[in-house]
């Protein structure tokens, strides 16, 4: 058993108490991972002094309920004056268990960062690679950490250092993943990011910019005080509001306002994006003029032609007061067969079907309808290209003394078959003409300066409209790869032109010739990989034209 913190004074006649080897508390012990508890803190305890007596001990009583025996009491004379001062220090550490003061925790973070960097350099010298993570830290490293803490005035065993590092790594991982924790802490997220952010012994590039003890203590010691003089409350003033997870039974605090606001904004942005996608799908369904079919029974979805088809489908409804059918939901079923997806929307055991059944039972809706348009795999990828793939701008360079611009294709274009699109940023050379018309139909009544100074609303409109990218070509990389096709478009000359590509190639080549002081049009590309066997199926150009709402200029 570890020495009790609250042991009563022993009779003077008894022989000196022998301190057995201390037992390190496991992480599952009550309070073992607590960061601090003001009721048990004693920040005034100087470094090298122990609450158990004048013998050498750890710097400061532990914060939190991590002590193996609970309260703090006077030490017996046998313990205080026994020749084994190191044993008394071990007893003090055992009494604190895994409870760490803010000063100890920050010192551990700094020392661990230094040791981690040294370990990585050793591995480089040994030829083990230039990354953290070639091997996990061993007992020797925790012994070095323990000795380094002792030099700073904090007596901690290698086992305690190992358990505390594991706790800090869990804190960092959970805060990194969830962005929220249980309580405030004396250390900042940036500290953990610099120490554990390189992957935590995973394969990541070696970054020598790590926290060190001198840099960590410099700001706190500049006012003449020492780390031990800071109480738990004072530490809160010198640290950020890091909410980290601990494995004790603690209440989950509310998410900080800034993080909560950021999460709300992120969710609202995602919801807006989903609404835009669904609106686009509804426009596609309306453009092909499909008829609504009334849902009557489960036999509607047992038909063979619904079983394994991909499709664009919509769910609609009407009410007793209005017979017009309105959309409830629309989706491109590009991964799951249409029959399976529709069954989910008409199965009361599924979340989607439960919503529909509830609204019908409560007479919010009168009837439920559905419509669908079968699509091929290549058409599904084409719609994915339009709705989910972002545009990539094409850079260009101008040779010295010439008026011909050269395109610079980005790296990472796949050497595989697929679909690609080329677009350009819409140029508005006359953005002010609609705003100038209300001033009067007679140009003589207008002064030249009036048309040259647009209003703030006009500037905003020009900025918003100029960001629109117009599709002009859809390419199918079936015989050649995506990389080869795009290279032929952007790097071709008159010798490599073909009749099939003369339209888009002529446009791109003409855009390379610019007048002095005039920039070429901004060109963009996007692409998606598709298996070669699927590219020949479907009407891809018409599919994309229906989705974007206008014809492709260079495909016709």
Curated annotation (Swiss-Prot):
Annotated Pfam families: Myb_DNA-bind_4
Q: Where is the composition biased (Polar residues)?
A: 1-10, 36-45
Where are the annotated segments for Disordered?
Answer: 1-82, 431-458
In this chain the Myb-like domain maps to 99-169
Stored Gene3D superfamilies? Homeodomain-like
InterPro entries attached to this UniProt entry:
MSANTD2 (IPR042792), Myb_DNA-bind_4 (IPR044822)
Query: Which portions of the chain have biased composition (kind: Gly residues)?
Result: 56-74
Question: What PANTHER family does UniProt report for this protein, alphabetically?
Answer: MYB/SANT-LIKE DNA-BINDING DOMAIN-CONTAINING PROTEIN 2, MYB_SANT-LIKE DNA-BINDING DOMAIN-CONTAINING PROTEIN 2
Protein known as = Myb/SANT-like DNA-binding domain-containing protein 2
Annotated gene: MSANTD2
């Amino acid at each position: 058993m570890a020495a009790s913190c609250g042991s009563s004074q022993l009779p003077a006649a008894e022989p000196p108490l022998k301190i057995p080897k201390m037992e390190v508390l496991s992480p599952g012990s009550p309070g073992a991972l607590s960061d601090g508890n003001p009721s048990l803190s004693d920040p005034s305890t100087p470094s090298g002094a122990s609450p158990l007596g004048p013998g050498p001990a750890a710097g400061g009583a532990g914060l939190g309920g991590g002590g193996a025996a609970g309260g703090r009491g006077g030490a017996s004379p046998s313990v205080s004056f026994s020749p084994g001062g190191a044993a008394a220090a071990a007893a003090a550490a055992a009494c604190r268990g895994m409870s760490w003061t803010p000063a100890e925790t920050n010192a551990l973070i700094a020392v661990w960062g230094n040791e981690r960097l040294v370990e990585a350099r050793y591995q480089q010298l040994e030829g083990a690679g230039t990354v953290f993570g070639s091997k996990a830290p061993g007992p020797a490293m925790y012994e070095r950490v323990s000795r380094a803490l002792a030099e700073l005035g904090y007596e901690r065993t290698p086992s305690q250092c190992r358990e505390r590092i594991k706790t800090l790594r869990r804190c960092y991982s959970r805060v990194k993943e969830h962005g929220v924790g249980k309580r405030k802490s004396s250390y900042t997220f940036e500290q953990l990011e610099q120490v554990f952010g390189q992957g935590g012994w995973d394969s990541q590039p070696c970054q020598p910019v790590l926290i060190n003890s001198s840099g960590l203590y410099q700001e706190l010691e500049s006012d003449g005080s020492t780390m031990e003089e800071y109480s738990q409350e004072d530490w809160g003033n010198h640290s950020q509001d890091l909410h980290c997870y601990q494995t004790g039974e603690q209440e989950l605090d509310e998410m900080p306002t800034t993080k909560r606001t950021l999460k709300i904004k992120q969710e609202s942005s995602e919801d807006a994006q989903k609404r835009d996608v669904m609106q686009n799908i509804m426009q596609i369904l309306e453009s092909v003029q499909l008829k609504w079919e009334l849902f009557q029974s489960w036999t509607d979805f047992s038909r063979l032609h619904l079983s394994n088809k991909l499709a664009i489908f919509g769910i609609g409804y009407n009410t007793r007061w209005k017979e017009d059918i309105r959309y409830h939901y629309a989706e491109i079923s590009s991964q799951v067969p249409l029959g399976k997806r529709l069954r989910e929307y008409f199965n009361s055991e599924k979340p989607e079907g439960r919503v529909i059944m509830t609204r019908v039972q409560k007479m919010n809706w009168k009837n439920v309808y559905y419509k669908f348009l079968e699509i091929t795999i290549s058409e599904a990828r084409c719609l994915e290209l339009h709705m989910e793939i972002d545009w990539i701008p094409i850079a260009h360079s101008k040779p010295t003394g010439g008026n011909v611009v050269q395109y610079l294709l980005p790296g990472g274009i796949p050497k595989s078959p697929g679909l690609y699109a080329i677009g350009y940023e819409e140029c508005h050379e006359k953005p002010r003409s609609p705003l100038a018309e209300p001033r009067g139909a007679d140009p003589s009544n207008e002064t030249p300066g009036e048309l040259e100074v647009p209003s703030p609303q006009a500037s905003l409109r020009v900025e918003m409209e100029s960001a629109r990218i117009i599709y002009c070509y859809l390419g199918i990389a079936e015989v050649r790869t995506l990389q080869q096709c795009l290279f032929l478009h952007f790097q071709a000359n008159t010798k490599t032109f073909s009749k099939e590509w003369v339209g888009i190639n002529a446009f791109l080549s003409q855009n390379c010739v610019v007048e002095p002081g005039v920039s070429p049009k901004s060109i963009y590309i996007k692409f998606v990989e598709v298996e070669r066997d699927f590219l020949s199926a479907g009407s891809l150009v018409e599919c994309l034209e229906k989705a974007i709402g206008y014809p492709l200029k260079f495909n016709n």
